[in-house]
């Protein structure tokens, strides 16, 4: 099971890395690409999401799972922090606390994954992506074009 969790983590990290690498050297575009990659059909597949949530549910009682899951969050957080820092500098945004913003984005991303997984109302990957992009439009209003 550890191998499965590691594989899923590497798979997600590869999608994220490719999303950033295949985007222009523009922090708003990179942020949009990074977060959109979370809702790619290869990542936000119902079966794969179910696996993630099963492992997360066991993480507290299984130190190996917790370590692997925490590594995923740390890598994601570092990528977000780097890009958001560049975006804040470029856009001269004030009063944005990067650690809190990153934690909020990660929590939202995980919550949107959960909505995809359990919704009986047809909440889909595209809905999740639209919610995230709408949020980013409000946080970074001078860069809305990247999130449309």
How would you name each of these model-derived features?
Residues 5, 31, 69, 73, ...:
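Hydrophobic packing residues in well-ordered alpha-helices of helical domains and bundles
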Residues 19, 36-43, 50-61, 135, ...:
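Helix-loop "lid/cap" segments that line or gate small-molecule binding pockets
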Residues 3, 25, 29, 47-50, ...:
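Short, solvent-exposed positions on alpha-helices
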Residues 1-17, 32, 77:
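An amphipathic alpha-helix adjacent to DNA-recognition modules
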Residues 67-72, 89-107:
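All-alpha amphipathic helical-bundle segments outside canonical DNA-binding/catalytic cores
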Residues 17-48, 101-105, 147:
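Hydrophobic alpha-helical connector segments
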Residues 33-37, 77-86, 108, 114-148:
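C-terminal peripheral helix-coil segments that are non-catalytic and often amphipathic
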Residues 44-50, 63-89, 130:
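Amphipathic alpha-helical packing segments from all-alpha helical-bundle domains
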């Amino acid at each position: 099971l550890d191998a499965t969790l590691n594989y899923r983590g590497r798979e997600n990290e590869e999608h994220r890395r490719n999303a950033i690498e295949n985007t222009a050297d523009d922090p708003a575009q990179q942020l949009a690409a990074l977060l959109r990659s979370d809702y790619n059909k290869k990542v936000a597949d119902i079966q794969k999401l179910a696996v993630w949530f099963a492992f997360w549910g066991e993480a507290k009682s299984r130190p190996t799972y917790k370590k692997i899951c925490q590594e995923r969050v740390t890598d994601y957080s570092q990528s977000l922090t780097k890009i958001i820092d560049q975006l804040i500098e470029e856009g001269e945004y004030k009063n944005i606390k990067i650690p809190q913003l990153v934690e909020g984005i990660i929590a939202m991303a995980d919550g949107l994954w959960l909505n995809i997984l359990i919704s009986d109302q047809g909440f889909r990957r595209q809905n999740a992506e639209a919610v995230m992009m709408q949020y980013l439009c409000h946080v970074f209003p001078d860069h809305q074009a990247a999130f449309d």
